[in-house]
Amino acid sequence: MSKSTSVSTILYLRQRLQGLKIYETSDLIQHINTFDELVGEQVSVDVKIEEKTKDMILLCSLSPLLTTLTCSMVKVAASLRFPNERWLEVITKEPRAFVYHNFLALFFKICKTNEECDHLISLAKPSMARSKVRNALTGLGEESSSRTSSGTFIRSGHDKIVKEIEKRISEFTFIPQENGETLQVINYEVGQKFEPHFDGFQRIATVLMYLSDVDKGGETVFPEAKGIKSKKGVSVRPKKGDALLFWSMRPDGSRDPSSKHGKRHCLSLNLF
């Protein structure tokens, strides 16, 4: 599943960044006239999740991350609605990519039943159709051997659960709900794939929510990303309930070439 947003939200993001307050590290921000004026030396920031969760996510998401800034955040305690701990993991700085573990609510931990994941799958199944790619010349969608999955869209605000998820995505990304696209559910059967590509130029960020588990394959791959120890290429393994956020544009509005991504073949089971 994925959800993307338009470039028109850049001004909103800058406005939110200007209002950012991290009291324990007031010397961290020297100038916030533009995104690329954040910090000049390495700083590690720890905050109390109850008070500054949103500020921390905003700082980690919007800072250029081409500097030596390092972000860290304490885990969110388990609760009845979210019996597993929820926490944010920085995957790579180029592109800016993060995984929010246990993003979707798990109601019955013992039975491994994830109501939000299963609910979205049940809404999507009746209307699934072959996925398409946009023709660069005509602008129209067409089937392609580069994308062999199937998918469908879920109307915004379809029901209470969909509304809650859309609200959570907005809070996670600090992007207004009205600037996001409708939820799109994608299904990859065994052997299906989506070859590396760039998201449309009208998008600045994408959130991929994993609705199911697979034993082998199905990773989201960033072939041009800068990984650990300068190794080229990063992959994210799907885990039911997790959400992957990555930014297709740099803070200055230019396209990030390292945001090129694809989906590996599923070698066992189906992936939503």
UniProtKB/Swiss-Prot annotation:
Cofactor requirements of the protein: Fe(2+); L-ascorbate
UniProt GO cellular component terms: endoplasmic reticulum membrane
Keyword line: Dioxygenase, Endoplasmic reticulum, Iron, Membrane, Metal-binding, Oxidoreductase, Signal-anchor, Transmembrane, Transmembrane helix
Domain Fe2OG dioxygenase span(s) in chain numbering: 179-272
Keyword Cell membrane belongs to the record: no
InterPro entries recorded: Oxoglu/Fe-dep_dioxygenase_dom, P4HA-like, Pro_4_hyd_alph, Pro_4_hyd_alph_FE2OG_OXY
Top-level EC class as recorded in UniProt: oxidoreductase
Cofactor: how and how many bound: Binds 1 Fe(2+) ion per subunit.
Record's bilayer topology term: Single-pass type II membrane protein
Catalytic activity, as annotated: L-prolyl-[collagen] + 2-oxoglutarate + O2 = trans-4-hydroxy-L-prolyl-[collagen] + succinate + CO2
E.C. designation(s): 1.14.11.2
Ranges per topology, Cytoplasmic: 1-55
Primary subcellular site in the record, as a coarse category: endoplasmic reticulum
Key word Transmembrane present: yes
Segments in the Lumenal topological domain: 81-272
Positions with a binding annotation for Fe cation: 197, 199, 261
Transmembrane segments: 56-80
GO MF entry, a single one: iron ion binding
Localisation per UniProt entry: Endoplasmic reticulum membrane
Pfam (any one): 2OG-FeII_Oxy_3
Domain of life (superkingdom): Eukaryota
Recorded family membership: Belongs to the P4HA family.
Purpose: Catalyzes the post-translational formation of 4-hydroxyproline in -Xaa-Pro-Gly- sequences in proline-rich peptide sequences of plant glycoproteins and other proteins. Hydroxyprolines are important constituent of many plant cell wall glycoproteins such as extensins, hydroxyproline-rich glycoproteins, lectins and arabinogalactan proteins.
Official protein name in the record: Probable prolyl 4-hydroxylase 11
Name of the coding gene: P4H11
